[in-house]
Amino acid sequence: VTIADRTKERGSVAGETRSASLLACVVNVSEGRDAAFLAAADDCTASSRLDRHSDPDHHRSVFTLAGPSLEADVARLARLCLTRLDLRRHEGAHPRLGVLDVVPFVSLRGNPTEARRARDRTARLLAHDLGVPVFLYGPERSLPEIRRSAFRTLEPDLGPSRADPRVGATACGVRGPLVAYNLWLDPRTPLARARQVAAALRGPEVRALAFRLGDRLQLSFNLLDPQVVGPAEIMDRAASLVSVVGAELVGLLPAAVLARIPPDRWGPLDLDVTRTVEWRLAGHGLLEPVPPAQAD
């Protein structure tokens, strides 16, 4: 998260700062197993990192970044990925374009155009300074469209027209706050049935995929409008169609989304106030603490 033109004045309401803009970047990296690499990635993002979620099955890590050094830390993480990772050796369940796979900027408060400007600056750095093909998403197109069409019917927006097979390409985007969320199914469920359920649950607010991960079965979601369809709603909808045995929050969620869910459901849904964006921002001195009941 970065705060542009941030003033020293705090808002009078808990959870508010008076600032021109409040941005986040949620960097998805195609590495979820190498402890030495992940330690180096933690080090180079230490000043802005709100959270890191690493998944060895998907072989993927998600870094939620915040703070005045946001763009510098994204650049440091990008250079580390391009130097240390090799897409040719990558094996994982999750679709990926490159070692630095997805770099979305998110406007949390203030002028949404600031997120697009940050995206465009980062895209130019990746393409022109680091030589990575960059596909833009947001107003231009959706991320799923890039995954379907990159290097087939869709050329990179910036950078080389062909990707180095070692590092691949990057999707650099701008989007609203979403919740990444996984549900674990009864492993005896056929994968074909899990895919049917994923298809049934997809909609304007929900992207869904089904994966067999060893002896486990997962539904993986991006909840694009979590105020409409959040973790509780997707759990209830899925449980009406298939046997669900567990849940997993990937990264963080907005406090306002948590506030909509009865606290007695937080545990089974793998949710907690300490895993809200606002709680982590407060821990970095970027925002006053926000009790979930006060989020709006």
Regions found by a protein language model. Name each.
Residues 3, 15-296:
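Long, contiguous binding/interaction regions
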Residues 9-12:
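Short linear segments in intrinsically disordered or otherwise low-structure-confidence regions
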